[in-house]
Amino acid sequence: MEKLVINKLPTRTWNRLGVNEALIEWDAENAEKLPEERVNAAADEKKTAHITVRGDSEYAEKTVTLTLAPGAELTVFEDMAASHKLSVKTDVTLGVNAKLRLVQVQSAGEQGLARSAITADCAEGAGLELVQILLGAGDVYSDCLVELRGDDSGFKS
């Protein structure tokens, strides 16, 4: 059993209030590895994709990879539901002037835990728009790290 750090800040601020980060216990060794999903958008292509993830095992993990070639525009709807413990890692790579709108709906049942971890790499002129809807009676966590590597790249949440 390991502890995952959620919302790790580069500088500890307001630490005395205990609001810098959250720790959750995670059993990576015994977690069910759900099939990886990939969505690719070719240069100048415009499309929409839907991804549904259900975590019914005691611990379940999934990786989603989104890759956009230069000039591509993609809208992705990620629907995640956890009856137990679910961790979804979304890796994003945006080429020059590519645009991604990522809409995530996360829900956790009363005994559930849903965790979303997004990493994104944005080239020059690329843009990521993130919309998150966090629902449920259980615990819901979200972590996001976006690298703006080129001029005029952007992130909106």
Residue ranges and their predicted role:
Residues M1-P35:
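Short, Gly/Pro- and small/polar-rich lid/capping loops
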Residues W26, K33-S157:
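Conserved beta-strand/loop scaffold segments within soluble protein domains that form the structured core
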